[in-house]
Amino acid sequence: MADYGAQLLWLRGEQDFLGNRYSRRHMLRFDGGVEIAASSSPHVVPVPMSDPAAVDPEEAFVAALASCHLLWFLSIAARRKFCVDSYADSPLGVMARNSEGKLAMTVVTLRPQVAFSGSRLPTPAEVVEMHHQAHAECFIANSVKTEVRCEPVFAAGTADSSTDD
């Protein structure tokens, strides 16, 4: 078992807190020293009280799911002796009412595009299986109720990459 944490800091300064006219911008700090500007989403709290240039919790949630999946996929591919040259994804989360009628991130769709090289290339079926296994192992996906879909995009770098699955 391991513990994971972060630090958050928000300061009111001279802002009109009681009048609900305060910035939602804050800082996230992680154990390696990385600091990221964070804010509420402008879809939830209008600008200028939110900062569209900062990471919002919804984006961070989608990114955490995609990052966890990526790391598991790379590990699985390496164990299976498939050389991954690149992995790109543009995950998309959908905020909607869940079965309890509450706003929630109800679906996150990953669209990974992986390029391989070497004499041993995975078939599209093997790529799909590695994505399935990565999803099953992902700590973040195993921690949430959100439906997480994986729709791999095939390009050059898989055996028989012209095959549609």
Where are these regions (language model features)?
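Extended beta-strand/beta-hairpin segments
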Residues: 1-63, 71-165
